[in-house]
Amino acid sequence: MKVKQICMMVLLWLGVIPAVQAQTFDKLWKEVEQAEKKSLPKTVIKLTDEIYQKGEKEKNSPQMLKAYTWRMKYREMLNPDSLYADLKGLEQWVKQTDQPMDRAILHSLIAGIYADYAASNQWQLRQRTEIVDQTPATDMREWTANMFIEKVRTNIKEALADSVLLLKTSSRGYIPFVELGETSEYYHHDMYHLLASRSIEALQRVEELSNRITNDGTVNPVKQDIIAIYGNMIPAYKATGLKEGYVLTALNY
């Protein structure tokens, strides 16, 4: 009888732990929202750092990803140069993680950051002579446009490398980092649609820069990458029987 009672208590405790953890994260994020409304960036940074460390301890990737990106945003608001250290942190994370899905998401984030930086600094990049066949400097402020474009393309390739995994992984599993949109419902909220869409957006942000580099009549590799992503998505959704996803992708293409 005692053994049965102990077993029941253990099972109940195991069921309670995840709920308590979720409540704790929710409480912390509510504090973040309050700090944000009060325009307290240092408090937001402190709280998101706490969430990140808690997520790391509990191996909760969605919480870690959301906390890291929020902390990164507010650190950059206070000190723009923090972007470089935080980007290196993401690149170190992607090397160390043993979770394929986390790795894909991190590559997608990194690609987006490089694309945003290049797009925001187009004028300066256009003044520089392209450097090819040379390892980029440690400081990306010294890079040329082609180096950023290559970083974006390489990280996107890694992000979408395992399309089978992305198709069978629901973005629901990455809440609260992922916010479910209405359109993603037509794709059954799979991670393939999410990361492919992010990849296309990142490539589009550097497409104009790439046009400048390839104005000698050669085909723009960035444009080719965009076409290739759509070209892979259409048959993938057709094969899985997602009619709505297939039609929407074909229309966007």
Q: Where do the protein language model's features map onto the residues?
A:
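Extracytoplasmic/secretory-pathway proteins
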Residues: 25-31, 35-253
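Bacterial Sec-dependent N-terminal signal peptides
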Residues: 1-28
